């Protein structure tokens, strides 16, 4: 558990520095050929501009969110050192460049051929289903594939073996905190406190989360004979992710439909990946990746023409169900580009790290626990484990790792 907390601390700390030095300029700087920003490194030139500071801080929190998505998916097996490098790269390069294409005046939103196709506007993403969540989800997929499953996650026949989470109570508490926080995430993306659409966005956000959670609950109840708490929690987050792109442009009834579909996606997406050997500890890929994609497509389907593009003041955003086939095509293009960019760059990053520094701890360290092996602490120091309470082999492995770490260093480098 300490390892997960430490990764999240570094996602925000290292991510803040990386986004300050490089990421913000690539994302929001003056565009070069609508591909990447070229000005504003280290916030040079705008250090005392209130608007620049506010934009940097607002976008930073979104950036850190994308980084933390990967943390949950690849838990319990990556080296801490290489994880810190990953965190810096996603915040400095991967998230900002795709973000520039949609939010920084880049080609997906503003190129002539995209605006002509969409009927006056290119691809859109109100608050980050694609820019934040799908990017994080598909980088997580790349990380899971490169790392492989945890020891004991599958038997010799390849059948998945459940590994229970640390605390369902904390998971539910976290879901409620996220649910509440999303009312800053989505309504806050209006960038204006007097924007009247805030009320619609808040209602849509809540309805979609509720519909997705209820759907996930009924699916697991039907499948297992009992309503599954963890999958219902993932349903809440899946609904929040799915509504993040279309929240300003769809009607409340559409938000409910989007949430119902999100509930199906998170359940069956997780089981599909699990059967194929993808060990996604937190369900981040179906929650954020697949439902981030669904959010982009849902915008292209359900946008009802009652609200414009807040950035360009385009009056009416309409989707496929309201006769705008071209805008749905723009969203499809955005989905394909999103997956290709996030998964491609994520796979390349983890591949390079794997074949240089290494990305996975040793089997002994993994079994002993990364709290002890890489951070030198245990989560609950007052707990006393006896032989009957823990497998003997794991106790021996833990002791051997601790002894090895306490041996005098004789020079050389650990692989």
Where are these regions (language model features)?
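Glycine- and aromatic-enriched membrane alpha-helices
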Residues: 1-415
């Amino acid at each position: 558990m300490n390892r997960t907390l430490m990764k999240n601390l570094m996602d925000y700390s290292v991510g803040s520095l990386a986004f300050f030095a490089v990421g913000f300029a690539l994302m929001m700087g003056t565009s070069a050929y609508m591909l990447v920003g070229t000005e504003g490194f280290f916030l040079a030139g705008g250090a005392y501009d209130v608007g620049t500071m506010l934009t940097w801080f607002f976008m930073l929190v979104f950036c850190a969110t994308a980084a933390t998505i990967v943390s949950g998916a690849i838990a319990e097996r990556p080296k801490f050192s290489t994880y810190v490098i990953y965190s810096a790269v996603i915040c400095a390069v991967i998230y900002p460049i795709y973000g520039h294409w949609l939010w920084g005046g880049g080609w997906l939103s503003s190129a002539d051929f995209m605006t002509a196709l969409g009927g006056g506007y290119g691809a859109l993403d109100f608050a980050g289903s694609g820019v934040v969540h799908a990017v994080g989800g598909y980088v997580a997929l790349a990380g899971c594939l490169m790392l492989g499953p945890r020891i004991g996650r599958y038997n010799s026949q390849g059948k998945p073996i459940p590994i229970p989470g640390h605390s369902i109570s904390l998971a539910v508490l976290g879901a409620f905190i996220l649910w509440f926080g999303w009312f800053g995430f989505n309504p806050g993306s209006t960038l204006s406190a007097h924007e009247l659409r805030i009320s619609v966005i808040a209602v849509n956000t809540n309805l979609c989360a509720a519909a997705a959670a209820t759907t996930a609950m009924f699916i697991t109840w039907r499948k297992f004979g009992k309503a599954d708490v963890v999958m219902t929690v993932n349903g809440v987050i899946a609904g929040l992710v799915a509504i993040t792109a279309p929240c300003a442009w769809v009607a409340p009834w559409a938000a409910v439909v989007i949430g119902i579909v999100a509930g199906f996606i998170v359940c069956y997406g997780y089981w599909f990946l699990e059967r194929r050997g993808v060990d996604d500890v937190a369900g981040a890929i179906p929650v954020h990746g697949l439902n981030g994609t669904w959010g982009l497509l849902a915008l292209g389907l359900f946008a009802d023409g009652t609200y414009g593009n807040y950035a360009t003041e385009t009056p009416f955003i309409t989707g496929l169900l309201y006769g705008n086939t071209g805008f749905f095509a723009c969203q499809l293009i955005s989905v394909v580009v999103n997956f290709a960019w996030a998964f491609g760059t994520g796979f390349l990053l983890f591949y390079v790290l794997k074949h240089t520094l290494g990305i996975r701890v040793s089997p002994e360290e993994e079994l002993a626990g990364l709290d002890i092996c890489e951070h030198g602490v245990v989560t609950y120091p007052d707990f006393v484990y006896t032989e009957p309470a823990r497998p003997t082999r794991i106790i021996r492995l833990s002791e051997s790792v601790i002894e090895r770490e306490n041996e005098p260093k004789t020079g050389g480098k650990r692989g």
